[in-house]
Amino acid sequence: MRMKKWKKIFAAVLCACLFLAGCGRKEETENISRETQESQSDEGEIKIGLSFDSFVIERWIRDRDVFVDTAKKLGASVNVQNANGSVKEQISQIEYLIDRDVDVLVVIAVDCGALTEVMHKAKEAGIKTMSYDRLILNADTDLYVSYNNKGVGTLMAKALKNAIPDGGDIFMIQGAEEDNNVKLVREGFE
């Protein structure tokens, strides 16, 4: 029975993430939705903790709204936390979500290398964990949803090569070093 619950939890979270990423086909999403809703009466509401690094980037506000709306339609509740760019605050909020006994913890990390310990605490508490967009390093999360960041870097490099005359200089401004995606985009760019 417990394994069935985890499958339903992952189905709900995965469905919400696929909806955000625009990767799921309509019929797949509807099947997952129906399966998740059928399981709700048997096992109670799924509780999802969703920890954002900040809402400075407009995308995160949009992702939050779509994620929460999709989860509610699937019968899950979402506790949204915003760390406002503070690693210390995000760790505190993740500990809060662990104490609230969420079933799944979805994290957009402020610092990809600073959350390892608190994510291990979540796993020890039996909470399924997911890195959303930014891989939390050495945390052994159950799921990682993101873009092909190396591919993004390669596409950027090709576009610049086609747009700039031979021998032209390129000055590249990147994101924060705490974001593992920066490293991956750079690898693809080179």
Q: What is each of the regions a protein language model found here?
A:
Residues 6-12:
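Sec-dependent signal peptide recognition
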Residues 2-5, 23-190:
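A residue-level marker of the well-folded mature domains of exported/periplasmic proteins
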Residues 18-22:
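C-terminal motif of bacterial Sec signal peptides marking the signal peptidase cleavage site
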